[in-house]
Amino acid sequence: GLICNAAGVFFIYSANRVSNDVRRATFSPRELAELTMNFYRRNYIEGLFLSSAVVGSPDYTCERMIETLRILREEYRFGGYIHAKAIPGADNALITRLGILADRMSVNIELPSNNSLQTLAPDKTKESILRPMGLITNKIKESSAELVRYKHAPRFASGGQSTQLIVGATPASDYLIMSLSAALYKKYELKRVFYSAYIPVVENPLLPAKTTEPPLLREHRLYQADWLLRYYGFDANELLDEKHPFLT
Protein backbone atom coordinates (compact mmCIF):
# COMPACT_ATOMS: atom_id res chain seq x y z
CA GLY A 1 0.00 0.00 0.00
CA LEU A 2 1.23 3.46 -0.87
CA ILE A 3 -0.32 6.46 0.87
CA CYS A 4 1.33 8.86 -1.56
CA ASN A 5 3.87 8.52 -4.39
CA ALA A 6 4.78 12.20 -4.60
CA ALA A 7 8.38 12.19 -3.38
CA GLY A 8 8.89 14.79 -0.68
CA VAL A 9 12.67 14.46 -0.83
CA PHE A 10 14.94 14.52 -3.87
CA PHE A 11 16.14 11.19 -5.26
CA ILE A 12 17.83 11.58 -8.64
CA TYR A 13 17.24 7.90 -9.48
CA SER A 14 13.51 7.80 -8.66
CA ALA A 15 10.74 8.04 -11.25
CA ASN A 16 8.63 9.76 -8.56
CA ARG A 17 11.24 12.33 -7.58
CA VAL A 18 10.06 15.89 -6.93
CA SER A 19 11.31 17.28 -10.25
CA ASN A 20 9.74 14.56 -12.43
CA ASP A 21 6.51 15.41 -14.22
CA VAL A 22 4.52 12.30 -13.32
CA ARG A 23 0.98 11.94 -12.03
CA ARG A 24 0.79 11.88 -8.23
CA ALA A 25 -1.62 9.66 -6.33
CA THR A 26 -2.73 9.97 -2.71
CA PHE A 27 -4.99 7.73 -0.61
CA SER A 28 -6.61 8.75 2.64
CA PRO A 29 -6.02 6.36 5.57
CA ARG A 30 -9.66 5.23 5.38
CA GLU A 31 -9.48 4.60 1.62
CA LEU A 32 -6.31 2.55 1.91
CA ALA A 33 -7.65 0.56 4.88
CA GLU A 34 -10.86 -0.26 3.00
CA LEU A 35 -8.96 -1.22 -0.15
CA THR A 36 -6.71 -3.52 1.89
CA MET A 37 -9.66 -5.19 3.60
CA ASN A 38 -11.47 -5.73 0.29
CA PHE A 39 -8.44 -7.54 -1.12
CA TYR A 40 -7.90 -9.45 2.14
CA ARG A 41 -11.50 -10.71 2.32
CA ARG A 42 -11.20 -12.00 -1.26
CA ASN A 43 -7.95 -13.81 -0.39
CA TYR A 44 -6.07 -11.72 -2.96
CA ILE A 45 -3.51 -10.72 -0.33
CA GLU A 46 -2.21 -12.07 2.99
CA GLY A 47 -0.70 -8.84 4.24
CA LEU A 48 0.16 -5.21 3.62
CA PHE A 49 3.42 -3.40 2.92
CA LEU A 50 2.77 0.22 3.87
CA SER A 51 4.99 3.00 2.57
CA SER A 52 4.65 6.64 1.60
CA ALA A 53 6.48 9.60 0.22
CA VAL A 54 6.79 12.47 2.69
CA VAL A 55 3.59 14.53 2.55
CA GLY A 56 3.90 17.89 4.27
CA SER A 57 6.31 16.71 6.96
CA PRO A 58 7.71 13.41 8.27
CA ASP A 59 5.48 13.61 11.36
CA TYR A 60 2.30 14.26 9.37
CA THR A 61 3.13 11.41 6.99
CA CYS A 62 3.80 9.02 9.88
CA GLU A 63 0.53 10.05 11.54
CA ARG A 64 -1.38 9.15 8.34
CA MET A 65 0.33 5.75 8.25
CA ILE A 66 -0.52 5.17 11.92
CA GLU A 67 -4.16 6.07 11.29
CA THR A 68 -4.30 3.61 8.37
CA LEU A 69 -3.00 0.79 10.56
CA ARG A 70 -5.21 1.81 13.50
CA ILE A 71 -8.30 1.54 11.30
CA LEU A 72 -7.17 -1.84 10.02
CA ARG A 73 -6.23 -3.32 13.39
CA GLU A 74 -8.79 -1.75 15.74
CA GLU A 75 -11.87 -1.12 13.58
CA TYR A 76 -11.63 -3.82 10.91
CA ARG A 77 -9.78 -6.40 13.04
CA PHE A 78 -7.34 -7.04 10.20
CA GLY A 79 -5.39 -10.18 11.08
CA GLY A 80 -2.95 -10.16 8.18
CA TYR A 81 0.75 -9.39 8.19
CA ILE A 82 1.78 -5.73 8.11
CA HIS A 83 5.20 -4.43 7.09
CA ALA A 84 5.54 -0.67 7.60
CA LYS A 85 8.31 1.51 6.24
CA ALA A 86 9.44 4.03 8.86
CA ILE A 87 9.66 7.67 7.81
CA PRO A 88 13.13 9.15 8.53
CA GLY A 89 12.79 12.39 10.47
CA ALA A 90 9.53 11.43 12.19
CA ASP A 91 9.25 11.81 15.96
CA ASN A 92 10.37 8.81 18.01
CA ALA A 93 6.95 8.48 19.64
CA LEU A 94 5.29 8.22 16.23
CA ILE A 95 7.73 5.58 15.00
CA THR A 96 7.09 3.66 18.23
CA ARG A 97 3.32 3.79 17.69
CA LEU A 98 3.77 2.62 14.10
CA GLY A 99 5.88 -0.32 15.28
CA ILE A 100 3.24 -1.44 17.78
CA LEU A 101 0.69 -1.68 14.96
CA ALA A 102 3.04 -3.39 12.47
CA ASP A 103 4.58 -6.86 12.39
CA ARG A 104 7.80 -5.74 10.71
CA MET A 105 9.43 -2.36 10.07
CA SER A 106 12.06 -1.17 7.66
CA VAL A 107 14.20 1.90 7.06
CA ASN A 108 15.61 1.73 3.56
CA ILE A 109 19.24 2.76 3.19
CA GLU A 110 18.96 2.51 -0.63
CA LEU A 111 22.54 3.62 -1.35
CA PRO A 112 25.61 1.99 0.22
CA SER A 113 27.90 4.97 0.89
CA ASN A 114 27.85 8.55 2.11
CA ASN A 115 29.19 9.75 -1.24
CA SER A 116 26.38 8.11 -3.18
CA LEU A 117 23.79 9.52 -0.77
CA GLN A 118 25.19 13.03 -1.15
CA THR A 119 25.26 12.69 -4.93
CA LEU A 120 21.97 10.94 -5.70
CA ALA A 121 19.83 11.63 -2.61
CA PRO A 122 21.10 14.92 -1.17
CA ASP A 123 18.04 15.34 1.07
CA LYS A 124 18.81 12.01 2.77
CA THR A 125 21.62 11.65 5.32
CA LYS A 126 23.29 8.74 7.04
CA GLU A 127 22.08 10.03 10.42
CA SER A 128 18.47 10.36 9.24
CA ILE A 129 18.53 6.66 8.29
CA LEU A 130 20.48 5.18 11.19
CA ARG A 131 18.64 7.09 13.95
CA PRO A 132 15.24 5.44 13.33
CA MET A 133 16.98 2.13 12.61
CA GLY A 134 18.64 2.28 16.03
CA LEU A 135 15.37 3.29 17.68
CA ILE A 136 13.57 0.32 16.14
CA THR A 137 16.33 -2.05 17.29
CA ASN A 138 16.08 -0.76 20.86
CA LYS A 139 12.28 -0.91 20.88
CA ILE A 140 12.31 -4.52 19.65
CA LYS A 141 14.69 -5.45 22.49
CA GLU A 142 12.58 -3.58 25.06
CA SER A 143 9.42 -5.26 23.81
CA SER A 144 10.99 -8.73 24.02
CA ALA A 145 12.10 -8.05 27.60
CA GLU A 146 8.65 -6.73 28.57
CA LEU A 147 6.91 -9.78 27.11
CA VAL A 148 9.00 -12.02 29.37
CA ARG A 149 7.69 -10.12 32.39
CA TYR A 150 4.17 -9.30 31.19
CA LYS A 151 2.36 -11.67 28.83
CA HIS A 152 0.05 -8.94 27.54
CA ALA A 153 2.68 -6.25 27.02
CA PRO A 154 2.35 -4.58 23.59
CA ARG A 155 4.47 -6.18 20.89
CA PHE A 156 6.74 -3.97 18.81
CA ALA A 157 7.56 -5.14 15.26
CA SER A 158 7.65 -8.77 16.37
CA GLY A 159 8.89 -9.77 12.91
CA GLY A 160 11.98 -7.59 13.28
CA GLN A 161 13.27 -4.98 10.87
CA SER A 162 14.83 -4.98 7.42
CA THR A 163 16.35 -2.60 4.89
CA GLN A 164 16.95 -2.37 1.14
CA LEU A 165 20.00 -1.55 -0.96
CA ILE A 166 19.90 -0.49 -4.61
CA VAL A 167 22.47 -2.35 -6.71
CA GLY A 168 24.02 -0.79 -9.79
CA ALA A 169 22.96 2.85 -9.48
CA THR A 170 26.46 3.79 -8.30
CA PRO A 171 29.97 2.34 -8.75
CA ALA A 172 29.82 0.77 -5.26
CA SER A 173 31.41 -2.68 -5.25
CA ASP A 174 29.90 -5.92 -3.95
CA TYR A 175 32.59 -5.86 -1.26
CA LEU A 176 31.32 -2.49 -0.01
CA ILE A 177 27.71 -3.67 -0.14
CA MET A 178 28.39 -6.94 1.69
CA SER A 179 30.56 -5.19 4.29
CA LEU A 180 27.70 -2.78 4.98
CA SER A 181 25.18 -5.63 5.21
CA ALA A 182 27.40 -7.55 7.64
CA ALA A 183 27.73 -4.44 9.83
CA LEU A 184 23.95 -3.87 9.79
CA TYR A 185 23.22 -7.47 10.78
CA LYS A 186 25.69 -7.21 13.64
CA LYS A 187 24.88 -3.74 15.02
CA TYR A 188 21.15 -3.47 14.33
CA GLU A 189 20.24 -7.18 14.35
CA LEU A 190 18.31 -6.88 11.09
CA LYS A 191 16.23 -9.83 9.93
CA ARG A 192 16.95 -9.17 6.27
CA VAL A 193 18.80 -6.93 3.87
CA PHE A 194 17.06 -6.87 0.51
CA TYR A 195 18.96 -6.14 -2.70
CA SER A 196 17.24 -4.51 -5.66
CA ALA A 197 18.82 -4.28 -9.12
CA TYR A 198 18.69 -0.69 -10.36
CA ILE A 199 16.32 -0.27 -13.30
CA PRO A 200 17.14 2.91 -15.27
CA VAL A 201 14.01 5.05 -15.61
CA VAL A 202 15.49 8.56 -15.81
CA GLU A 203 18.20 10.19 -17.89
CA ASN A 204 20.95 11.74 -15.79
CA PRO A 205 24.72 11.91 -16.30
CA LEU A 206 25.22 10.65 -12.74
CA LEU A 207 23.31 7.43 -13.47
CA PRO A 208 23.68 4.47 -15.84
CA ALA A 209 22.11 5.10 -19.27
CA LYS A 210 18.46 4.12 -19.71
CA THR A 211 19.59 1.42 -22.15
CA THR A 212 21.63 -0.30 -19.41
CA GLU A 213 20.36 -3.76 -18.49
CA PRO A 214 19.40 -4.17 -14.80
CA PRO A 215 22.13 -6.17 -12.99
CA LEU A 216 19.85 -9.10 -12.14
CA LEU A 217 22.62 -11.70 -11.96
CA ARG A 218 24.57 -9.45 -9.60
CA GLU A 219 21.46 -9.09 -7.42
CA HIS A 220 21.16 -12.89 -7.34
CA ARG A 221 24.83 -13.32 -6.34
CA LEU A 222 24.42 -10.79 -3.52
CA TYR A 223 21.47 -12.77 -2.16
CA GLN A 224 23.60 -15.93 -2.27
CA ALA A 225 26.42 -14.18 -0.40
CA ASP A 226 23.91 -12.73 2.07
CA TRP A 227 22.68 -16.27 2.79
CA LEU A 228 26.25 -17.22 3.76
CA LEU A 229 26.41 -14.23 6.12
CA ARG A 230 23.10 -14.97 7.84
CA TYR A 231 23.04 -18.74 8.05
CA TYR A 232 26.66 -19.86 7.99
CA GLY A 233 28.36 -17.07 9.90
CA PHE A 234 30.63 -15.92 7.08
CA ASP A 235 32.21 -12.48 7.22
CA ALA A 236 32.29 -10.21 4.17
CA ASN A 237 36.11 -10.40 4.22
CA GLU A 238 35.91 -14.16 3.73
CA LEU A 239 33.94 -13.74 0.52
CA LEU A 240 35.49 -10.63 -1.01
CA ASP A 241 38.31 -8.16 -0.53
CA GLU A 242 39.65 -4.96 -2.09
CA LYS A 243 41.58 -6.94 -4.72
CA HIS A 244 38.50 -9.03 -5.58
CA PRO A 245 35.59 -6.63 -4.93
CA PHE A 246 32.91 -8.24 -7.13
CA LEU A 247 31.10 -11.58 -6.92
CA THR A 248 30.81 -11.97 -10.70
Label each region the model flagged.
Residues 160-166, 170, 191-192, 198-200, ...:
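Catalytic cores of enzyme domains
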Residues 145-151, 195, 234-241:
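Flexible, glycine/charged-enriched surface loops at secondary-structure junctions
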Residues 203-248:
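Long, highly charged, low-complexity intrinsically disordered interaction regions
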Residues 151, 155-157, 164, 175-186, ...:
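Long C-terminal interaction/binding lobes of large macromolecular proteins
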Residues 96, 107-110, 175-206:
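Extended low-complexity acidic/polar segments
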Residues 1-5, 10-163, 168-172, 202-211:
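Conserved Radical SAM active-site core
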